[in-house]
Each structure stands twice: as C-alpha cells, then as structure tokens.
Amino acid sequence: MIVLNNIALFNGHADHFCGDACVAFTDGHIIYAGPREGSPSLDDGAQVIDGHGHFVMPGMVESHAHLSYTNNGPLELDKSPVEEVVIKTIHNARVMLGSGFTSAISFGSVHRVDAFLKRGIECGDVLGPRLLAGGRDIGSTGSNADLHPDYAQLKIDGLGMITDGPWEVRKAVRTLSKNGVDVVKVMIDGELISSGGGIKPGVLGFTDEELAVLVGEAHHRGMRVACHARSAAAVKQAVKAGVDFIGHANYLDDEALALLEENRDRVFVGPAVAWEITFLEHYQSFGFETGSPEHEGYAAELEATQASVKRMREAGIRVLVGGDYGLNITPHGTYAKELQYFTDYFGFSPGEALQAATKHGGEAFMPDGSLGTLEAGKIADMVIVKGNPLEQIGVLQDADAIAAVIKEGQIYTGLLDNQSPHQKNAEQLNQLLGARPCN
C-alpha cells in the first residue's frame, strides 16, 4: 500500500475539494481518498509519502487524441515516412502522459500506428497513456479524408480510407477491426479548409444507410465510433446512427439538441476548439487575409460553438476535453490549454473544466465507471501538481508544475524533460516532493 499524505485533494467532482487529505492505493486501485481524519489505519509495510501540500487530482483524459500526428500542417498529415511517424508518436505518447493525461481516446491515426502504440504501452515497451486506438479516417470520395486530387496520383493512403456504398464501408470497418482498432473515426461532414473540392461543413459525406452500416458493423465487432460533425445536419445523422463520440458539434438546431439530450446517457461531445482558436491567431501564416471566407468562417464557427456548448450544458450533455492537438499550430504538449479554453470561452468554472477532463472523460473511456475519479475501487490514476488548478487552471500548462503522474499505481516523473529513470518508487517520490514543498 502507498499512502499520499498531507495533500490537497480534488476527486473529480466539480464541487469537491479537501484541503487536508490523503489517498491510499494498492495494486493499481484506490483504497481511500478523502480527509486525513477518518483515513484507514495503515498496514504493516505501508509506504507513506508526505505530499507537502501538493494538489492531487485524477489523471486527465484527452478525448480527441491524434498521437500519430507529428505537428505538421493540416494538409500535410500523411506526408511523413511511416518510420518517422512511429518515432515521433512514441515521443508524443510520453509527452501526453507527462502532461497529466493518463488516458486518451483516439480520433484518428496515421497508418496503423495507434494499434501498435497501444500494444507497446500495454506491454511496457512505450511510456504513454492508456489508449483507445484509432485507425485511418473513413470518408467518402470528396470528403475531408480525401486529400489528394485525382491528377496527382500520389498513392498516399496513410490518413484516409475512401469508401462509397454500404459494402465498401463495411469492408473498411472490418479491415480496421483486423488491424486492432478500438475506435472507428468517420468524417460525416467537411471543413472550412479542405484541399481541392473537399466538402464543407453541412455537406454530408455519407448517406444514412452508409453511416448506419458503419456504426452497426463497428459495434458488432466491439468497436466504438467517433465522428467529425460540425453541422446540425451531421450531428443529427450521427446520433440517429448510434455514433458514440461526436467531435465538434459547432452548429446545433433545436432538433439536434433534442436528439443529444435524449441520448445523453450514451453519447459524448467534444467541441475540440483548439484548431479554431489558434487558426484565428495565426491565419495569416496560412496565407489568408482578414475578412477572407476562411477567417470569417472560423470566427463565426467559434461563436456558434460557444452558444452550442452553453445549450448542451443546460441539457445535461457531457462535454469532453480534447482538442485536435498534433498540428503545427496546436502542437503536442499543449493539451492543457483546452481546459483554459473551457473556462475562457465556455464559462466553465475551473472545477467544472477539471470534471470534464477527469470524471466525464473517464466515463467516456470506461463506461463501467472505474476511471476518472479518486474514490475507493477506482483505478489509481493521479496528477500531483505544484499549485492549485481550482484557483488558476492555467497551472496545468506549466511543465514544471506537474510534479508527478501516477498511472494505475505506477509513479512517473521527468517525462517532459527526459530525466531518467522515468518510473519512481514511493521513497523517491517522497524525496522529490520534499524538495519542492507547497506549504
């Protein structure tokens, strides 16, 4: 048994905070998390760590992950050699874990990298978050997954699987299942920035029949389905087909909101606004002018997203943290910016943003409820922070403030600065926290 004593505790519920607390865990699971007064008696041989006032919270869940994206531009995602992608993906996984994200739901992978990354993490060869592995995006001809014009004949297919018709869709899902994928990603509508004649938001890439076949085949094979859906039409098609994770949902009409509310016990929505926000900061570097359709379009999209998230929160729909990190303007390692966006743009309190990243993310990752909060019986995933995110959510963006990360009872430090060894025992963590006390 390991006991973290003398800590400030946030257990994953938005309204919970305990300033004089302890957490006890063994065999990768929580035994107790709460006030020091009333904590269980220690077993012989229990290892006690003095937390020196550090803030302890559940490990976070990145719910829109692209670990195999290598900080390229949005139209360059499949241009790197697969060998280079693998090397960078291993680095990205370590950075994500070191940033306090102990779990990740993939929203798409280049090539088959995610599935092999998951195997490497599970067998201990790679340091990274537990992963629901994604595969190549499934899209129709002319969709946001169909990046290359016919005349180019580039023979590059590392990002998308282009399918038309129910049987092509079904075969693509079966191929992903064969490759070890957990989450099938489908492009339901388009993007304001698309190569060539790619479809835009609001234009559906698949018929109702095609999408129903995709979801049905995925669920039949034990996989879940994530989608890119910006428009109300795309959200409605996704919910009706049974999609599990909806990415973006920027524009909602009354019917789309009603469908989401009716299915709020099974469906999760992640607005993933990092792209829009950073594009509006850097659009000129992409060659766009102020007032261009793309600039005005993303500004309107961000404003619409704020209204949509407000309505979803009022309807009790779980809104998740995760934001298309892995692009050149949203690089790996900046994942915690998303919590800041939740407070700045969506009106979340810091506690509500933390709950979205922990409790609700855990419910999305593991529907059985075993992940995302620090309560007896739950998986022992924790982040030890020098500072109080409930007072200043931005502290989670400071690499120096992440004192340690605990994933399923294993303690890690130094993942962001290449210190070695990364894994620590209780005595080493006790020494580390004592060297940088918070009280």
Regions found by a protein language model. Name each.
Residues 1-21, 26-27, 36, 90-97, ...:
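Active-site microenvironment of metallo-dependent hydrolases
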Residues 37-57, 80-83, 177:
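Active-site metal-binding motif and surrounding structural segment of the metallo-beta-lactamase
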Residues 52-54, 64-68, 219, 228, ...:
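Histidine-centered divalent metal-coordination motifs
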Residues 54-125, 141-145, 209, 241:
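Metal-associated gating/positioning segment near the N- to mid-region
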Residues 88-114, 127-137, 181-194, 224, ...:
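Divalent metal-dependent hydrolysis catalytic cores, especially in the metallo-beta-lactamase
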Residues 188-303, 320, 325-327, 346-348, ...:
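Active-site core of metal-dependent hydrolases
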Residues 220, 290-293, 302-388:
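His/Asp/Glu-enriched, well-ordered alpha-helical/loop segment
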